[in-house]
């Protein structure tokens, strides 16, 4: 499979009739089909997708996977190991255990740290908040438990809190400052007010690389609050924890190693195939306290120092998820992986500089990592009309195959969001895309939006 070029379509999407036709034509029948025709059908099915590896695809954090990850994934599927326990998977389990120690070291966790590979950030967050609940909340007081997030926290946190039984009224949403970082002063006051009302604060969720802007919460300050208040600090580093592998930008995540738990996605900024998620805990016993099980049909014997991963995760049967990442890092080394991450910083800063060169464009948030949020603001239009215009511009960029730059909401207003994590993309590509975007924006019809230009 060749990587797409700029002239290839960024996305191909089924419409309703095509969906019906595909489902009717390609579902299994009573008679066998020849392999060659089914391979062609497979390619036809996968052709209808967003090409995240396209050089003009800037819409999602999950990055272009390294070909090395494909090879590691191929071996993982080929051997089809059930990495559930040491007795059936001692080799892959040993490497998963080793990778957990190595990753924990990269983010500054102590030697006592542990963890496991999971399907992605959502499952990593779920595992971490279960561990926090079981460590700090007595079962009879769970209805009083209170969690502190920010207005930039990823939706997976709210989802996993709901799954494990917490109601909306138990979740505090702390405002962020002008840098889109959790406001620690408001956090302190909110915790104090909750204690006065008889509630039981137990968990603070920090973000290391928010999805909206790439912002990183003040990790040291939040760790101080958590330590002083006796709370569990979870850092959602699904996107930004990878910055720890960069020599040039590692300082941005200073303090992440003070967390009680960290979620991390290899399929975001470590260039892995889906699904490569990691949950790390400061204390290796934390996950076992929540997930360890036994049964008469489990006959696993574990040598001293080894691990049965079914005791560290909600899952029992599980693939050897660590192997593709191990394979990639074993070949590349940490330094080259860090340089690939650095390229995302370069591309984002190039985009910011180029956008600022043109009139009527506004950068809406500081560029921290590889995300730029911005807005086209020609004079004479109201905010609501600008929202409509930016939505239309995003749609047209994709429809005309210029770029996939989707939208988000920043402080209640529509913003264009650019995310560059493909290490193969060069800065001159960004320059050309921004130029094309500006040219297109200047030709957008604005009749009915307070001014008339067609």
Curated annotation (Swiss-Prot):
PANTHER family associated with the record: GROUP II PYRIDOXAL-5-PHOSPHATE DECARBOXYLASE, MIP05841P
Pathway: Alkaloid biosynthesis
GO biological process: amino acid metabolic process; carboxylic acid metabolic process
Protein name per UniProt: L-tryptophan decarboxylase cnsB
Gene encoding the protein: cnsB
Gene Ontology MF: a single term: pyridoxal phosphate binding
Similarity section: Belongs to the group II decarboxylase family.
Annotated knockout phenotype: Abolishes the biosynthesis of communesins A and B and leads to the accumulation of aurantioclavine.
Keywords, comma-separated and alphabetical: Decarboxylase, Lyase, Pyridoxal phosphate
SUPFAM superfamilies: PLP-dependent transferases
Cofactor(s) it depends on: pyridoxal 5'-phosphate
The enzyme's E.C. designation: 4.1.1.105
PROSITE patterns listed in its UniProt record: DDC_GAD_HDC_YDC
Pfam families for this protein: Pyridoxal_deC
Organism: Penicillium expansum
Catalysed reactions, as listed in the record: L-tryptophan + H(+) = tryptamine + CO2
Residues making up the signal peptide according to the UniProt record: none
Protein function: L-tryptophan decarboxylase; part of the gene cluster that mediates the biosynthesis of communesins, a prominent class of indole alkaloids with great potential as pharmaceuticals. Communesins are biosynthesized by the coupling of tryptamine and aurantioclavine, two building blocks derived from L-tryptophan.
InterPro entries referenced in this protein's UniProt entry, alphabetically: Aromatic_deC (IPR010977), PyrdxlP-dep_de-COase (IPR002129), PyrdxlP-dep_Trfase (IPR015424), PyrdxlP-dep_Trfase_major (IPR015421), PyrdxlP-dep_Trfase_small (IPR015422), Pyridoxal-P_BS (IPR021115)
Residues with PTM N6-(pyridoxal phosphate)lysine: 268
